[in-house]
Amino acid sequence: MKFEHLFAPMQVGKVTYRNRIVSAPMAFGLIVQNPAARDFTYRKLEASAKGGNGCVIVGETDVNFTDAVRIPGFRPFDFAKPEEDPETFDAVGEYARRIKRHGAVALAELVHCGKEKVPFGPGQEAIGPIETTNLAGVKVRAMNEDDMARVAHDFAVSATYMQK
C-alpha cells in the first residue's frame, strides 16, 4: 500500500498542515489544572509535534461543567470569561504554544458526554437525544430545544476560548 501524499503539506481553509500525520486525541484537556500533571502532559503532547506529526489533538475537554462533564475533579470556570481564571487559560494555552513551536497544528477535542453522563454532584444530570437509562443505570432526560441551543452555544463558546 502506498501513501504518496502522507508527507505532503495540505491546506484546509486558512490552515496549512505540514503533512497528513495526525495524532489521536491525548490526555484530558483540563488535566493541566493540576500542577503535578502539567509537565508530563505537556511533554506527552509536545513529543508528537516534535516527532513530526502535522497535527496534535489535545484530548477530551468538556464544554460545560453541568451536564458535559464525564470525569470529575476539574475546577469549573466560564469559557466566556477567560480573565476570571487566568491560570487555567494560560495552562490550556500552553498546549498550543508547545505544539505550534514544532510546526504542527494544535487542535482540541471538545466534548459533551450526553447520555453517558454519570452525575457526580448536585445540579448535574444526564441528557441525551431520547429519554433512556444509560449503561451505568442513570436515567437520561431527553433534551429539549433549550438544551440543544445551550449545548450548541457551549460548543461555540469553548471553541472560541481555544482559539484565543
PLM regions and their residue ranges:
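Flavin-dependent oxidoreductase catalytic cores
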Residues: 1-164
